[in-house]
């Protein structure tokens, strides 16, 4: 019997680093914003582009430019090419870029049998089908002294001959948040797209700032608590792709008209009659639909049970330091906020309004408070969230502009935030058609996905039409 054909053929695996001599060896400490991500899974994303050319054209015309522009981009975003260093306890982990040694693993692959249109479709598909276009982050190296060195990022570009290209990314979240990642991708994209043009005529995004870490002071041993949990959970365990069984992922889009109708309904039902934002009302609607899906098989009948949703607020330019943290700061700079709603409210007749009011109140509370003073209590809220039934969180945000990634091929025809499959996350982005709608990614068991889809359509009919 002939050997089964593998769906992807690895053409090349190479290492991309900043241009020689452009970046000195650099060590960056982890801040209390970084430490919570030490124990969490990788952040994975995929960008699909239409591309009608052959593999030969792809290798000759597109890949060399992509690699060259990535090298230049890493000159400014060099931590992505570095390592997460984990010394033996009690020394804290840190980021390090070793000039002339460190690099980012870059894989070039070709699809031999996978259907590009099916892979990028919105319809439910087994979560494992996307893993073939995700890069494999190399395993950590451990020195004789017990110092663990973990690669931070890997990239993969895969061609589907005559159909399209997928650019995939895997990275440890401890190095930076979605704001920084979006900044990195847009800088790389701008360089790639401008290849061959006069550099003086190319408008590039602002450069990232690395020097602010020394002013981000821990307001109350916040990082120490996360380090203790990291060490107790076995710091030698390396994050990797773990595929849950019987899971599918699907994408749903709420149009601008549907969102405006949702806003009107919530405003009319709310006691204070205050307008709500697109983000809040969309999140409220999706959270309600998701919880209604999940509780159908729940054994608990307690009406006073409380469900929790974790949101994140960008702290750039919001912290009361003597020097503000700029929008281009490279790193994590997000504050977690827990939204809590009782079961009978979240499943009741005015469920979307209840969720919307709770989310709005939590955001207002966070934006009006001194975030540094509340930071020592963030861990308590997160632990409450973790221990609850069906804890839900968010990945991505429409404001990140993840569909603005034009590498000279036009904007993506699809974008996926893959790591939502690890459980309980809702992926958010702007709609790809530019109509100011919102795109939502969900991962569930197949049976539950059918229920979610049905509830979502019923909700749209009730609240948004």
Curated annotation (Swiss-Prot):
Highly expressed in flowers, and leaves. Lower levels of expression in stems, roots and siliques. Pfam families: Transferase. InterPro entries: CAT-like_dom_sf (IPR023213), Plant_metabolite_acyltrans (IPR051504). It comes from Arabidopsis thaliana. The gene is 3AT2. This is Coumaroyl-CoA:anthocyanidin 3-O-glucoside-6''-O-coumaroyltransferase 2. Coiled coil: none annotated. Belongs to the plant acyltransferase family. Keywords: Acetylation, Acyltransferase, Transferase. GO terms for molecular function: acyltransferase activity, transferring groups other than amino-acyl groups. Involved in the acylation of the 6'' position of the 3-O-glucose residue of anthocyanin. Also able to use flavonol 3-glucosides as the acyl acceptor. Disruption phenotype: No visible phenotype, probably due to the redundancy with 3AT1. The modification N-acetylmethionine is found at residue 1. The active site is at 173 (proton acceptor), 406 (proton acceptor). Its EC number is 2.3.1.-.
């Amino acid at each position: 019997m002939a050997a089964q054909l593998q769906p992807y053929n690895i053409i090349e695996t190479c290492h991309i680093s900043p241009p020689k001599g452009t970046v000195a060896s650099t060590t960056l400490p982890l801040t209390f914003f970084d430490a919570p991500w030490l124990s969490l899974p990788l952040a994975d994303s995929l960008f699909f582009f239409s591309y009608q050319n052959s593999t030969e054209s792809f290798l000759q015309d597109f890949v060399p430019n992509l690699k060259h522009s990535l090298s230049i981009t890493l000159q400014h975003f060099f931590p992505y090419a570095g390592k997460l260093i984990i010394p033996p306890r009690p020394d804290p982990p840190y980021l390090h870029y070793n000039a002339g040694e460190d690099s980012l693993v870059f894989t070039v692959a070709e699809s031999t049998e996978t259907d590009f249109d099916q892979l990028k479709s919105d319809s439910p598909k087994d979560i494992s089908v996307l893993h073939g276009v995700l890069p494999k982050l190399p395993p950590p190296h451990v020195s004789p002294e017990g110092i663990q060195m973990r690669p931070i990022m890997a990239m993969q570009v895969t061609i589907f001959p005559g159909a399209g290209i997928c650019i995939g990314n895997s990275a440890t979240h401890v190095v930076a948040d979605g704001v920084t990642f979006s900044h990195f991708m847009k800088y790389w994209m701008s360089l790639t797209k401008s290849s061959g043009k006069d550099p003086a005529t190319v408008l590039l995004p602002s450069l990232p700032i690395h020097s602010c870490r020394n002013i981000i002071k821990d307001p109350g041993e916040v990082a120490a608590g996360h380090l203790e949990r990291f060490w107790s959970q076995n710091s030698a365990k390396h994050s990797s792709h773990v595929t849950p069984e019987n899971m599918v992922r699907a994408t749903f889009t709420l149009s601008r008209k549907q969102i405006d109708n949702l806003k009107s309904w919530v405003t009319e039902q709310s006691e204070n009659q205050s307008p709500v934002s697109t983000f809040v009302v969309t999140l409220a609607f999706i959270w309600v639909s998701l919880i209604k899906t999940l509780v159908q098989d729940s054994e608990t009948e307690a009406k006073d049970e409380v469900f929790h949703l974790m949101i994140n607020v960008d702290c750039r330019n919001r912290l009361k330091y003597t020097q503000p943290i700029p929008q281009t700061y490279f790193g994590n700079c997000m504050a977690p906020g827990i939204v809590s709603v009782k079961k009978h409210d979240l499943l009741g007749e005015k469920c979307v309004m209840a969720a919307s009011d709770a989310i709005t109140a939590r955001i207002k509370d966070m934006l009006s408070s001194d975030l540094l003073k509340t930071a020592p209590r963030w861990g308590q809220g997160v632990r409450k969230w973790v221990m609850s039934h069906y804890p839900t969180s968010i990945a991505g945000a429409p404001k990140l502009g993840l569909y603005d990634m034009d590498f000279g091929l036009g904007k993506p025809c699809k974008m996926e935030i893959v790591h939502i499959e690890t459980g309980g996350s809702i992926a958010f982005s702007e709609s790809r058609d530019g109509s100011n709608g919102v795109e939502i990614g969900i991962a569930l068991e197949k049976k539950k996905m059918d229920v979610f889809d049905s509830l979502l359509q019923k909700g749209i009919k009730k609240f948004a039409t």
